[in-house]
């Protein structure tokens, strides 16, 4: 039954994506499209909401309206997208153009008039009469706002809901040459709780990967007892770009049955904060390594994720051998596969792990701790999962560590 539901979900996803117009929009640039950032890419505290298109390390390239429409928003800022344009199109979608150097003469004149009126360089404007035609030059590419180098940020949204949609779904994928498979640089296996062991450890264990004759990868064998989950560090490459960009989709299987999946097709802005639960945030905080978890301990509202009843976890039992398969895709269908052999650990000799905190916080409860000079209040759902914290006070200074 679960397999049928999973297949139906995949078919529904394909039907929804097929509904997006593939030839309605043109490229915003007249140069070969190479990417320095992909849709859904993992960024600090958010998912990347569009494509970052390389402009060959220069500014001043003509930026074109992707289709007929009306400019509904103009923003000038010293951070974020810098100088940005938002064009609503009659088919219900909005395109966004960010990090611009300069607007076209007509738009620039309107913006300057409003800046003088407001006596401010930074403005956010909502015009209703600035119409554009497909192929009009609307701006010059730049490096404004929070940009790390010259490029164009190009984005698609549903005009009515503001939901962000992968630009590849609108035909952008046809403009990008990509014959390279994603790369899985690291793979880790995690004990889910204190009663679980992985390779005789209660701490996460790194697995080695060996490439096989058929192009797939075989991970080192896992001996486990109890519930376990996996996480990977991965990136995508394209044919004409050296950037390590974000991957599009991950799907996992246990002995052939669907286990867990996430796919960067679309998401809403208020979902973006959940990136810190999709990744191993503690590892990122300490080592600056982004490992994407292939499991969830507590349900949370992230539409990108789908899984089975165990939320991606594997319950390793005696007298059963398991093969855990991971498939990592880019939008062009290039795929990397890792197979992980797993057996039940009959001999349990555990290595020591670091001590737990002095307070155990459950995500579905609230807490109030009073010290001599300070008070700590932790509301319900302050954490994505149960956590042990060391909380102490010294000379009126509160110290909280996980």
Predicted regions and their residues:
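Bacterial Sec-dependent N-terminal signal peptides
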Residues: 1-24
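Surface-exposed, glycine-biased beta-strand/turn segments
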Residues: 18-95, 101-106, 120-128, 133-134, ...
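Exoplasmic/lumenal beta-rich domain surfaces
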Residues: 94-128, 195-197, 206-217, 253-315
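Surface-exposed loop/turn motifs at beta-strand-loop junctions within extracellular Ig-like
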Residues: 139, 158, 236, 328-332
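Short beta-strand elements
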Residues: 206-207, 321-323, 331-358
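Short coil-to-beta strand junction motifs in C2/discoidin
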Residues: 243-248
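Surface-exposed, short loops/turns at beta-strand junctions within beta-sandwich domains
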Residues: 315-321
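Proteolytic processing hotspots in large secreted/extracellular or virion-associated proteins
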Residues: 349-352, 356-359, 387-402
């Amino acid at each position: 039954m679960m397999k049928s539901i999973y297949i139906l979900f995949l078919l529904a996803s394909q039907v929804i994506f097929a509904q997006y117009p593939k030839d309605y929009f043109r490229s915003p640039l007249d140069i070969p499209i190479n990417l320095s950032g992909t849709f859904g890419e993992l960024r600090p505290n958010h998912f990347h909401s569009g494509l970052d298109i390389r402009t060959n390390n220069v500014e001043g390239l003509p930026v074109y309206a992707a289709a007929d429409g009306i400019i509904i928003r103009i923003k000038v800022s010293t951070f974020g997208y810098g100088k940005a344009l938002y064009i609503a199109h009659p088919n219900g979608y909005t395109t966004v153009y960010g990090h611009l150097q300069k607007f076209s003469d007509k738009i620039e004149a309107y913006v300057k008039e409003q800046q003088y009126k407001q006596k401010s360089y930074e403005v956010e404007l909502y015009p209703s009469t600035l119409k554009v035609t497909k192929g009009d030059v609307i701006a010059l590419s730049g490096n404004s706002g929070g940009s790390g180098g010259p490029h164009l940020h190009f984005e698609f949204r549903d005009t009515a809901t503001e939901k962000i949609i992968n630009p590849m779904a609108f035909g952008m994928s046809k403009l990008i040459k990509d014959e390279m498979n994603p790369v899985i640089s690291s793979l880790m296996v995690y004990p889910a709780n204190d009663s679980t062991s992985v390779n005789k450890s209660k701490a996460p264990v790194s697995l080695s990967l060996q490439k096989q004759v058929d192009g797939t990868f075989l991970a080192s064998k896992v001996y486990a007892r109890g519930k376990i989950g996996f996480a990977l560090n991965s990136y995508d490459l394209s044919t004409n770009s050296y950037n390590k960009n974000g991957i599009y989709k991950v799907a996992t299987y246990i002995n052939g049955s669907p286990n867990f999946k996430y796919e960067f097709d679309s998401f809403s802005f208020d979902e973006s904060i959940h990136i810190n639960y999709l990744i191993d945030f503690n590892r990122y905080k300490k080592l600056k390594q982004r490992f994407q978890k292939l499991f969830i301990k507590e349900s949370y509202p992230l539409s990108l994720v789908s899984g089975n009843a165990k939320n991606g976890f594997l319950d390793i039992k005696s007298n059963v051998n398991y093969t855990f398969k991971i498939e990592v895709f880019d939008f062009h269908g290039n795929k990397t596969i890792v197979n992980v052999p797993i057996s039940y650990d009959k001999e349990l000799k555990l290595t020591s792990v670091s001590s737990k905190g002095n307070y155990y916080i459950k995500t579905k409860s609230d807490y109030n701790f009073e010290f001599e000079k300070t008070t700590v209040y932790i509301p319900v759902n302050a954490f994505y999962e149960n956590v042990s914290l060391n909380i102490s006070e010294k000379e009126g200074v509160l110290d909280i560590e996980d």
